[in-house]
Amino acid sequence: MNPTTATDAHERTSLLSGRPQSAANSTAPYERQVQPSRKSQCFTPVTVITIITLIYRLATTMVITTNIRVLHTVACQLWYHVNDPDVFPGGNIPEKYCALPGVDKYYAIMVSMTTVIDGLGGILGTGIASYMSSRFGRKPVLMFLLSCTMIDHLAILTVQNVYGWKQLVTFGLIMIVETIGNENTTVFLVSMYVVDVTEAERRTAALSSITGWLVLGGALAYSIGGSITTFLHSNSAVYIVSFSVTGIVLTFTAFVLPESFPAEKRDLLRLERLAETRGHSQSWTQKIKAVATVALEPMELLKPTFNPITGKANWRLVYCALHSFIVTLADAYALPAMLIFFTTQYSYTPAQMGYVMTTYSVSSVFVLAIALPLFIRWFKPLYNNTQTKSVPDEGDGLRATDSGEAGVHTQEVVVSETSDRMDVHITVISWTIESLAYIVLGTVGSFYAQLLGRPLPLLALDLDAFQEFEA
């Protein structure tokens, strides 16, 4: 079957294209779509969401290096409040008195908690954001997530000015807000928006462009945020700047960004759901279970599919998921552990942390944009090019990324080539480089040696992440 002719109309046409035209007057609107004016090209929905994504990434990333110092300060204050509250009753503790094993333990626990919360928020947030955006639209949910970011900054400003159990309660509020409105969920919603407003042939390029702007925003923000904190000698200044920038992004989103999932499609989806549940009364337990099922609905994609050519179940996605889980489990600990190590053992300033994280972003761009494509181009001829064809199961075409749009898409059969094992070899090489690089990074003692050694594990991590995405 020709994939081009089998593609659904909703996959081929932007959701913002408007109502269908009649046969008599369909030519002119079609020509306007194919040859848009220069003004419309400058202010397309993709352009608007790209601007929002870049500035959002800049605002949220510039506080990361200062977050490390704030967490260490809060951990020190909590440790003294619990173990020796009479020494510093006001909470103003000199930094030299925080160099204690107990403080380092509190700090490690707090960093681990933020990492775990971020991961859980990514798992639950994507499903919930998909469901809520299918009911209320992409734009309102995006505005809600931006509001959560602003509340998070206010809470971090507050936690620096309270002491004792109020500080602990405020830290708990920060954890809750970051679970709901974390960056992973926001980026996921942006990706859904791009899929809505772009045609099938242009989606890969649009998503790649969004990713590139995200990396650029992060690369600029790390150094900017760390420098603001270091040169102004204030942990609050960067949060005020980030709060203001996020507020501008929220206002821009409210008045400029068009909705990508219009009310007609939401109403149609609501009628489909009512038809499915008509005549079936649900208890509160069943309703709660249904909400949990929506949040975990992306996990259903891991179900093995049947390959009609081989006559066997296709477990490749399950293997990739297991690999991603194991590697991410290690990498998710390695980065916070490295930041804890640099903060507690070498007393890195936010500016130095900014240089380290900037090196991270630059190395990511180098690996994904230059090194990896050249590597594949040079070594691809060495591999056996005789590859078997794989036809996905019929159910694959019906699985939609958005839980609310499963009934809108139709089947698309795609014939793909199986792996020539080059991706497997790149993954193994990345494991080796990353393992050795972290060992070397822990043995060097100077800042510049650590700065030069930092890109090596990230290079391996980017290689591994790209192979997971390609698989």
From Swiss-Prot:
Q: Which Pfam families match?
A: MFS_1 (PF07690)
Q: Which residues form a coiled coil?
A: none
- InterPro entries assigned: MFS (IPR011701), MFS_trans_sf (IPR036259)
Q: Which residues are glycosylated?
A: 25, 384
GO function terms (MF aspect)? transmembrane transporter activity
What does the UniProt entry say about where the protein is found?
Answer: Membrane
Q: Where are the transmembrane segments?
A: 44-64, 108-128, 140-160, 168-188, 212-232, 237-257, 322-342, 356-376, 424-444
Please provide one cellular component term from the Gene Ontology annotations of this protein. Answer: membrane
Which keywords appear in this protein's UniProt record, sorted alphabetically?
Glycoprotein, Membrane, Transmembrane, Transmembrane helix, Transport
Where do the segments described as Disordered lie? 1-36
Membrane topology annotation: Multi-pass membrane protein
* Residue stretches of biased makeup (Polar residues): 14-36
> What does the record give as the function of this protein?
Major facilitator-type transporter; part of the gene cluster that mediates the biosynthesis of psilocybin, a psychotropic tryptamine-derived natural product.
Which family does this protein fall into?
Answer: Belongs to the major facilitator superfamily. TCR/Tet family.
User: PANTHER family of this UniProt entry?
Assistant: FI18259P1-RELATED, ZGC:174356
Q: What is this protein called?
A: Major facilitator-type transporter psiT1
